[in-house]
Structure formats: structure tokens, C-alpha cells
Amino acid sequence: MKRKKRYKHATIGKKKYYFYKIVWEDPCGDAGHADIDEMKKLKPATMISQAYIFAKDRRHVWTFSSYDSEAAVFSDRNCFPRSIIKKM
């Protein structure tokens, strides 16, 4: 029986990119008029993205979800500010 891999990754070129589930907060807005009660009800949405980590530094995380198996070409790309990421 084949053993399950501990971490899912993709090898593109000679580099491994690891797959993550990223929980992050998306700011929400409304351009209409609102009273105090409606204003306090406005909360950010908790979003979940599943993607490979391309790179990260102390301020940002770059991800991709699709890639070309023949060349280092990436699609479905995002750049997340670290301040909105709640869990990886």
C-alpha cells in the first residue's frame, strides 16, 4: 500500500511549491446610506483560499493555483498582505 505524502507540493523546474489552505479576512463595504446600527453590523468576510505558495516575505504572501507542467508559467495568482491572513 502506498504511503500518503505528509505535505502536498508541486515541483516546477527544480523548485518545490507547497500547497496551503489560507484563511483570510476580506474587507467588506457598502456605498449606500446607513444608520449607526447598520454601520456596526458591517464586518469583514472570512475567506478560504487553497493555493501553492510562490513566495513570502514579512509583509506579503504570493500564491498561485494553476501552473503549466512543461514550463514555469503560473495562473490564478494572488498577493496577500500578511495583515489580513489569519491562518495558513
Label for each model-derived stretch:
Residues 2-88:
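Conserved RNA-binding domains used in RNP assembly and mRNA/RNA metabolism
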